[in-house]
């Protein structure tokens, strides 16, 4: 999640520790190493060079929190936990529709990263823009009502948005939905209209952000499972439930989604750098899936920690 959403950033990140480990990235094992088999399906990154990669809406370097979270800094945290590949998510608050830094990361490390980018559905030919970004490693697109101040209720009905969904059915680029529980019925309708479009719902549709796991919200999320190309990111633990490790209160929700979608349509993700703020940390996030949930088989864990994200995002 990012600064567009009203979630409190409780504390600044421990950037010094991140920077210390980043120097080891250049000598790290290959992405397909047995030591780093897992995929983090959702992390943001940004550089401190705001002159080279300008921020939107008049923001300056002082607005970055943390001041730097580069791909090297991310991998310095991820690799010790067995994560060798990451799906990088465009930060709508800092760079919005300018995907340049993420594209640069893929250019430098084409085997390690894929991108969920953003295009402006209010501009002409967003479908053409999507197709142009596919060879650059952009295999999904973040769509969200939170960037729209006008026509918020109709965000899925705009012609450009409909074009994006149609294009995704052609290219396999996923529509990655950053939404609230109240947005689930609208997304469900779009899945009905575009049954061949891959759809990923981020962060459990933010169920539990207020500490409550409402049955009606979970029913609406599980209802989406009837569309065969939908999958769920089980992610952003820092923002849900008790919002602190060991995150065990999320297990009943994960089990319910496991029963509705099956392991082949669930994927773990950290939502860094926000998962490493305050009392939260990267290890606690991946450990919930890797080490703690007893109803998962070894093969299930392969899907949640690697195969689903590989299938959805690393196809090109």
Which residues does each predicted region cover?
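Catalytic pocket-lining loop regions of alpha/beta-barrel enzymes
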Residues: 154-268
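Mid-to-C-terminal alpha-helical segments outside catalytic/metal-binding sites
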Residues: 2-27, 32-39, 51, 57-60, ...
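Short, glycine/acidic-enriched loop or turn micro-motifs at the edges of active sites
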Residues: 43-45, 206, 274
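Conserved, mostly hydrophobic/aromatic
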Residues: 42, 102, 168, 232, ...
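Short, electropositive alpha-helical surface patch
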Residues: 96-109, 195, 200-201, 253, ...
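Short aromatic-enriched loop/helix-cap "lid" or pocket-rim segments at secondary-structure transitions
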Residues: 49-54, 100, 128-129, 212-214, ...
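Active-site gating/metal-coordination segments in enzymes
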Residues: 85, 94-182, 189-191, 231-237, ...
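Histidine-centered catalytic micro-motifs
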Residues: 38-48, 201
